Amino acid sequence: MASLIYRQLLSNSYVTNISDEVNEIGTKKTTNVTVNPGPFAQTGYAPVDWGHGELPDSTLVQPTLDGPYQPTSLNLPVDYWMLIAPTREGKVAEGTNTTDRWFACVLVEPNVQNTQRQYVLDGQNVQLHVSNDSSTSWKFILFIKLTPYGTYTQYSTLSTPHKLCAWMKRDNRVYWYQGATPNASESYYLTINNDNSNVSSDAEFYLIPQSQTAMCTQYINNGLPPIQNTRNIVPVNITSRQIKDVRAQMNEDIVISKTSLWKEMQYNRDIIIRFKFANSIIKSGGLGYKWSEISFKPMNYQYTYTRDEEEVTAHTTCSVNGVNDFNYNGGTLPTDFAISRFEVIKENSYVYVDYWDDSQAFRNMVYVRSLAANLNDVVCSGGSYSFALPVGNHPVMSGGAVTLTSAGVTLSTQYTDYVSLNSLQFRFRLAVSEPSFSISRTRMSGIYGLPAVNPNNSAEYYEIAGRFSLISLVPTNDDYQTPIANSVTVRQDLERQLGELREEFNSLSQEIAVSQLIDLATLPLDMFSMFSGIKSTVEAVKSMTTNVMKRFKTSSLANAISDLTSNMSEAASSVRLTSVRSVGTITLPRARVSLQVGDDLRSMQDVSTQVSNVSRNLRLKEFTTQTDTLSFDDISAAVLKTKLDKSTQISQQTMPDIIAESSEKFIPKRSYRIVDEDIRFETGIDGTFYAYKVDTFNEIPFDMERFNKLITDSPVLSAIIDFKTLKNLNDNYGITKKQAMELLHSNPKTLKEFINNNNPIIRNRIENLISQCRL
């Protein structure tokens, strides 16, 4: 049978080389993965010997002394020592707060007996008594008066051979050095208003911050060193000193090191990231009440913004990882609203935004180290989506929100429609926010996260502001661009090609001949016959087959097959007899509808959910058991083969995903039969379940206890012609018992006879299965 292709893909082993494994790992995004290849993370191949490059000969030393400054009058900055260095005796400095404090400092040379000298202080001629008994030290004397016309009184002295004194304004006080060197120490004498206290210096001076008080004390006691590192070579006016808060430039290019061929450049950039989510909403076939999938898709977005008066063109790609699958089943009837799967991102999810712009920083982004970024948070709020049902009120899914917080940045490659770009990938972790999301007219409410149904909420884009910095090894010649080698990237975006291929595959369903499909489904398709219609070389077919097997081995079907034993045992034990006692013996569809109220409705829905889970595992059991009957997988493989032959867009890169996806998504509404003498049990993945007699097609009570025993021992058959179709065929056309048995066993010869006779019921059923072969 045609499903042989799926069995071969699962059972055949394959070989691969390490580069294939690395590329495969690189294309998958996983959470909590840190790559540390050394001091540099590169997207290509770094030089074999990468040194630090050329280093400057000189060493920059932060100046200790801020000065010297010319004699002047100023409002001394708070928390700064004013270190005064006079060269001769006389008035050194004076100051006042203009209300109740006037102070002055004079310098007296050695060997001066008690004498009276005249000084000009505060604009007045003042007679002061001074003395200095030392023969080697000079004496600084501090005088203070409390009224404008009061008398100056001596408060403190400092004896030193170095002719250095210092004072400082701090905490509304004036601090001053006193005593004799080398044991002079600081003290305070005045309480003043710092804001209005001016100081006038008659000698050159330096400014030393309070944090370097120990250095100032060393100068007072030991003098200035013979050679000083000063801010100014010669004394300058204090107005040339402008104390400003210096902030790092956000957008700058700094040369770290340089040789003849290479240089290291540090790029600092502010950044505005704008991104959008994309989604896919797929409606199931049938009456129009079912949706098969609502999922997130990668989204490219291009925009411009202004950075330092320069217009920047940027490109982002947004994708998600670690999604959570939800579903909703409103009931067992074909007119009950249901969503087979819809994706929601929550705390365990990640959002990836790949960013590139046309600035110099991205021109040679091949060899990069010291990559860092700081970004703001952003809240993404979901909008509303109305599910348009053919009849009745429309359910509306609305709400949901998550907060995106930066969780790291790494190198990546964006694949646009025309070019691949080395870019930065920003990773965001998620936290759920208010409001929760719900589906109106259902019991699904109060769930937190952001559903894929309308993640942008009619917003043009989401925006994040921040900055990044990196050091890149680039050619010394700015006109030369580093060639980009084949990269091992964090993600490779083939979604555009796959999207176009999916659309083509879905449109080809109408071109498939039903009778030819049955013939093809009975053929033992192997891997090479499956790919025989694809124009390619023999080597390409071998490589393609290997890639298909690798991808198929990680598909949902392959993972489910590996756990078949545990799945079947769990499925069998999950359906309990007690779970359907409240339903009783359900014989007709009308009776089932009449019982769907209150507790009976809830019990029916519980059984429907459990039966749906069992039916999925029945597919696995049938898949591992080869029979001569036709199965859903035979039809699925035949449709796949037909579409591959007709496709014009299939390629070696997209083939593995298409093969794996078809095994998971083709014919989502399947039913399976279990044989029990003259009784057939039929259960569907959509939750429907029937038990009926073979000879009359009359429905009988569904014996759950008997069903539990049969699902582990009896053979499983695909209900290609399901119970409703058989009953409709028998009621309208009448069929023999032999035909009934062959249709129940999905005999391909009998199916083809009905199709060739243009039986509308059988033909419509097969056409419906073909229409369900969608991606």
From Swiss-Prot:
- List the signal peptide residues: none
Q: Taxonomically, which superkingdom?
A: Viruses
| Coiled-coil regions listed | 484-511
In this chain, the stretch annotated as Hydrophobic covers: 389-409
Where the record places motif YGL motif is 448-450
Q: Would the keyword Disulfide bond be found if you checked this record's keyword annotation? A: yes
Q: List, alphabetically, the InterPro entries matched.
A: ConA-like_dom_sf, Rota_A_VP4, Rota_VP4_MID, Rota_VP4_MID_sf, VP4_concanavalin-like, VP4_helical
Q: Name one GO biological process term.
A: virion attachment to host cell
Where is the stretch described as Spike body and stalk (antigen domain)? 248-479
Question: Which is a Pfam family this sequence falls into?
Answer: Rota_VP4_MID
- Spike foot, as annotated region: 510-775
| Region annotation Spike head: where it falls in the sequence | 65-224
Q: List the GO terms this entry assigns under cellular component, sorted alphabetically.
A: host cell endoplasmic reticulum-Golgi intermediate compartment; host cell plasma membrane; host cell rough endoplasmic reticulum; host cytoskeleton; membrane; viral outer capsid
In chain numbering, where does the site feature Cleavage fall? Answer: R231, N232, R241, Q242, R247, A248
Cystine pairs: C318-C380
Keyword annotations of the record: Capsid protein, Coiled coil, Disulfide bond, Hemagglutinin, Host cell membrane, Host cytoplasm, Host cytoskeleton, Host endoplasmic reticulum, Host membrane, Host-virus interaction, Membrane, Outer capsid protein, Viral attachment to host cell, Viral penetration into host cytoplasm, Viral penetration via permeabilization of host membrane, Virion, Virus entry into host cell
Q: Which family does it belong to?
A: Belongs to the rotavirus VP4 family.
Extra facts: This strain probably does not use sialic acid to attach to the host cell.
Q: What is this protein called?
A: Outer capsid protein VP4
Biological source species: Rotavirus A (strain RVA/Human/Japan/K8/1977/G1P3A[9]) (RV-A)
